[in-house]
Amino acid sequence: MNSTGSNYSLKHNNTQDNNHNSEESVTNKTGELDKPGVKDGQALSKEEKLKRRQEQLAAWMQKRQQENQEPSGKVTISATDETNIDKEKLIRQQRIEEWKRKRLQKSEGLETDRSKIKTFEVKSSNEPTIKINASMKKTITPANGRSKKRPIFGDEDEDDEKESKPKFKKPTLDLAEIEEKKPEKSIDTEIDELDKYLSLLEEKEQGVENKKIENHDDDGIANGPGVGNVNESDDEEIDEDQKQQDILSSKLNRLQNKQKQLDDVDHNQIQYHPFRKDFYTEPTEISKLPEEEVANLRLKLDGIKVRGVNCTRPIIRWSQLGLPSTIMSIIEGRLNYSSPSSIQAQAIPAIMSGRDIIGVAKTGSGKTLSFVLPLLRHIQDQPPLKKGDGPIGLIMTPTRELALQIHKELNHFTKKLNISSCCCFGGSSIESQIAELKKGAQIIVGTPGRIIDLLAANSGRVTNLQRVTYLVLDEADRMFDMGFEPQVTKVFTRVRPDRQTVLFSATFPRKMELLAKKILDNPMEIVVGGISVVASEITQKVELFENEDDKSLEEAKFSKLLSTLNDYGDKDAECKILIFVEKQIAADELLVKLLTEKYPCLAIHGGKDQIDRKHAIREFSSSNSGVNILIATSIAARGLDVKGLNLVINYEAASHMEDYVHRVGRTGRAGRKGTAITFVSSKQGRAITDLVKAMRLSKVSEDEINPRLIEISTKFLEGVKSGKEKYNFGFSGKGLDNLQEIRESNRDLERKVYGEENDSSTFKANEKKQNKTDIHQSDLDVKLPDFHIIEGRAPETAGPDKCKFHSRITINDLPQKARWITVNRDSLSKVIESTGTSITNKGNYYPPNSKIPKTIKQNGKEVTPPPKLYLLVEGLTEKAVHDAIILLREKMIEGLEVAAKEESMGPTGKYTV
């Protein structure tokens, strides 16, 4: 037990000695004093330990006093030093002010750079607050921990450059460290940090100036912004406006003039399969007839006149054509055509012989069947369509209604013969038409514009015309007159040259014959009953009004119309009546008047959607619909064939005789009788002359013609001879020449507005040398938005006279999508809020290619029509209006880009155009 206790006591004492030594070691490290010698393991009493501690503390205090006395000269600042410091601070402040003054005289190019750099603030307190840029945080520190100051103000700082200053250190949030280092800071350190900040600005300024020097041209003129010229910023603003205007103009023109590109076809590089044209073998009984009997036969057939080489003789019976029994059963059984009509008797043998034909015959004479029967023989003789093949027969018409009428006639045969056909026209969904063509259509009936769309759809992969061997132009004169010649020519260039081409119409003016001969090969001309002749089955009547006042004339015409409707309604309750007017607005106004008088009726014209036009014709054609009156423009004068249509009323006289022939030709079809009544005023000398001529050509006796009409006609023709009156024949009043005249008149008006009257005669002379029309230049000129700022209050505003500047921006001619993006509520509200201007929609929207009328009726009075749709921008300052214009122009450019993108993408669906 004793040995154990002694061992424990020894270990305990050693542990205590070690602890004492450790405490002494810590004390020595803290006080940084030498350790007195103490033997290891020696035990000390409390008194000895305390005495030794006191000695160590006294030595440490003495050493601290010596250390504090050595640097005292550095901290003490004498009065002389304080004066020198004040002078130095004053000099530096003066140099800073001088530097600021120089900075204000220089370009504003560094304003953005200066805004990015945080400011350096010196407060009035003893301790400065320093704000530094992020770029100043990373500095290269020399080995001695001090940084060299850069020259700022030139040679006057040479002395300062030789001095070395403490390195500027980033402030921290360590408060203990800040408090510890406060006594070591000096005023020189503050100024040195300011020098560093100013030197940084100087370096940035020199860098910008170097960039400007690099942008100088060889002539020494700076290209960069804000160099040397005060007005250069204005020039840049003008250039930017012009650049935006050019972008807007190019995008608008590109969108307006965008064509359906059809690549030229080199027929020499395509190996076409041969095909058969001649399907007709002249019967023996026809071939044995002498020429005298053939002439007599043509005379009996309404006086058929033929012109050409080796003209085919006419037939007498359907059996002489050698048609298949299936077709014969449809003709004689279903359609109940016992014998061919005059045009059919002469035209069908000629077409089936492989000849190109120009056929002119009166309305309702069976022209459609004349080109349909040979087409069916063409298709039956050729191999079936393969995948990717286009049609074999192509029929082009000027109007949608005529295309539907022909397609309806074709359906009598195609269903029985298992022949596929497709009717393609504008105003309806193109997707369904593309789907039908993808399935394979042996016959296409359509309008030229939609046919070109289909040829260009999907980069030409929808259909092609390589297999077309039979091409028909129905109502060819109207097609050329409506400006379709470029489209028709474009289609013709894509059809094989050895095709068979057939042209039919009820009228055929001489200048149209010249155009037709360009696309025909050795044609045979067939004229039945003369050119522009009303059928003998139609009774022509004229109601002459002697009223001088327009209002009384309108009342008299409407009163006569009501009495006529009552008379024919009493005679035949199922009688269909077609009323023609000249203008779309007149059709709508007459519709309202008749509905007010409790007459059920409908109206069709070019301004209505295709679905509405189709519905109106279907209701009018139906015997159970209760609608027996249809009001129409001349759009219904072609191809409309309605059973029971016994009366045609020209409420407004036709513009020329060919149009009159087609109008009245809607009745008296297929051998049935009909009546045509024309309302005309005694002031309409030209219309009366056409009526008298038409009645004389249709063999109406002079006794049946009103003597007053003959008197007015004779007087008018005498005026034409003397030069007092002008008499235009045929379609020349509405055709391609008239479009050119409209363009020239618009340009003359613009030159007068901008003071260029002197050059008008030269300009006209040069214009006449150019081509008359183009496929996409036939439209009226599109007006580019004008962004001129006008000083003064806009006259069309009714508010107080506060807005000193305004601008009118025409948006009528922009595409619909571009208009929506420009004028939607969000876009305009942003522009108004950011610029402080007022923006208002003014004017009316006028569709493309429409002509603004000189006057319109409003509340029974003739007033000036409103201008095209535009935005009125008003502001208190010119700058506010200019800023609004810039934003609106950007919206227009954005809208044009969206419109172009949507047009290139086409409608949502499987196919694109």
Curated annotation (Swiss-Prot):
It is found in: Nucleus. Residues 192-265 form a coiled coil. The keyword Oxidoreductase does not apply. ATP binds at A361, K362, T363, G364, S365, G366, K367, T368. GO terms for molecular function: ATP binding; ATP hydrolysis activity; nucleic acid binding; RNA helicase activity. It comes from the Eukaryota. It catalyses: ATP + H2O = ADP + phosphate + H(+). It is an enzyme of class 3 (hydrolase). The keyword Cell wall biogenesis/degradation does not apply. Residues 1-189, 209-244, 755-774 are annotated as: Disordered. Residues 348-526 form the Helicase ATP-binding domain. PROSITE patterns: DEAD_ATP_HELICASE, HELICASE_ATP_BIND_1, HELICASE_CTER, Q_MOTIF. Residues 45-55, 84-121, 178-188, 209-219, 765-774 have a biased composition (Basic and acidic residues). GO terms for cellular component: nucleus. Residues 564-713 form the Helicase C-terminal domain. SUPFAM superfamilies: P-loop containing nucleoside triphosphate hydrolases. InterPro entries: DEAD/DEAH_box_helicase_dom (IPR011545), Helicase_ATP-bd (IPR014001), Helicase_C-like (IPR001650), P-loop_NTPase (IPR027417), RNA-helicase_DEAD-box_CS (IPR000629), RNA_helicase_DEAD_Q_motif (IPR014014). GO terms for biological process: mRNA processing; RNA splicing. It holds the Pfam family DEAD. Residues 1-30, 68-82 have a biased composition (Polar residues). Keywords: ATP-binding, Coiled coil, Helicase, Hydrolase, mRNA processing, mRNA splicing, Nucleotide-binding, Nucleus. Belongs to the DEAD box helicase family. DDX46/PRP5 subfamily. The Q motif is unique to and characteristic of the DEAD box family of RNA helicases and controls ATP binding and hydrolysis. ATP-dependent RNA helicase involved spliceosome assembly and in nuclear splicing. Catalyzes an ATP-dependent conformational change of U2 snRNP. Bridges U1 and U2 snRNPs and enables stable U2 snRNP association with intron RNA. This is Pre-mRNA-processing ATP-dependent RNA helicase PRP5. It comes from Debaryomyces hansenii (strain ATCC 36239 / CBS 767 / BCRC 21394 / JCM 1990 / NBRC 0083 / IGC 2968). The gene is PRP5.
